[in-house]
Structure formats: structure tokens, C-alpha cells
Amino acid sequence: MECLFPVVQDEENAGVRTLFNRPCGYCEACRLTYRQTWAARIQLEAQCHAENIFVTLTYDQDHLPDPPQLVPDHLSAFVKRLRARFAPLQFRFFACGEYGSRTLRPHYHVVLFGLPCNAEVERQVLSAWGAGHVSISQLSPARASYVAKYVCKDISDDDKLPEGYQREFARMSRNPGNWCWFYRSCSGCG
């Protein structure tokens, strides 16, 4: 989808002045393109691993934050605990925190690259979460697209949130980063 409000870029290189349009990065079309790019990156990352899972983490009533909002540190701590349980095996992840559409109840979706969908992994994920319910399934293109939408700020309906609540967010593994394997495998790259 083409940018709805392209920005004119004026560039001079070796004495030659060039004017060209670049995407604004803010309009709905740009955010949709960005989301689609991240969904593709998640799918490419998934191709690097034999198995990948999609996990949903929800709070039970005893562990629901007060006020009931997303807590990014809960997600970070979960990933750290899970890494400790699976060491020395390393895995990568892409995660988002969102609110339920009807109840605004906070929960998290996590794509775990390199982990199989089996009872032992489910047991370890449940133990590492420790704050409520867990569901695990195979990663699909639709699920990759679903979590990718949270990389776009302001694409969700944040005006429905009470003032001061944590906004919906995305977090992912860093270094070497998604697509690194693709870059290295290209002829003539790096």
C-alpha cells in the first residue's frame, strides 16, 4: 500500500540535486506496511527453526495487577525465567501485550522460535509464567500477523484505556536480529 502523505526529500550527491518522495511513516498505509513487514520477518525467523510456538499468557484473579493493566516487566521476567529453564538451549521470541476487546483484561502473546509444541514445553512455560493460565499452539502466518500489529504505535484503540494505563506494546529478541540468516546467505552480502 502506498503512503497517503509522502514527504518530499531533497538530496544532493556529487553536486547533483535530487527530489524524491519517501513514505511519511505515520499514515495508516505506512503503519500497515510496517506491520506486514514485521509479520514477514516473524515468518522468516520461523523458517530458521524446526519448531515454533505461539503462547498466550493470562493472569488469574490472584495475580491480576492492581489496577488491571499490562506490566512489561512481567513479560521480561517471564522470558528470563524461561531462558533459565531451557539453558543451555537458546531461543528467540517476539511478544506483545494487549488488552481484551470486551473486558480490557491484560494478557500477552509470545512467539517462541525454536521450541516444540509439546507437554513438557507447556509445563515449563506454565511454571515460568506462574501468574495464571497458559495456552500453547503451533505458530501460523495468521498468528504472526496478529502479534506483528503491536509494533505499530497508535494502531490500536488506546483511547479506550483509562488514563495512566500502560499502552499495548511489542518486544522481541535483539542481536543478531531477525533476517540475519537471510542477510548472511545472500550472495555478495556481508
Predicted features and spans:
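DNA replication initiation on ssDNA origins
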Residues: 1-43
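Generic recognition of cysteine residues
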Residues: 3, 24, 30, 48, ...
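A generic secondary-structure signal marking the coil-to-beta-strand transition
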Residues: 23-26, 51-53, 143
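Alpha-helix initiation and N-capping motif
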Residues: 24, 37, 75, 118-122, ...
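Residues in well-ordered beta-strands of folded domains
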Residues: 28, 56, 94-96, 135-137, ...
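Signature for HUH/AEP ssDNA processing cores
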Residues: 33-103
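A generic structural signal for nonpolar/compact residues at packed positions
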Residues: 55, 108-109
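Conserved His + Asp/Glu catalytic blocks
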Residues: 101-106, 112-190
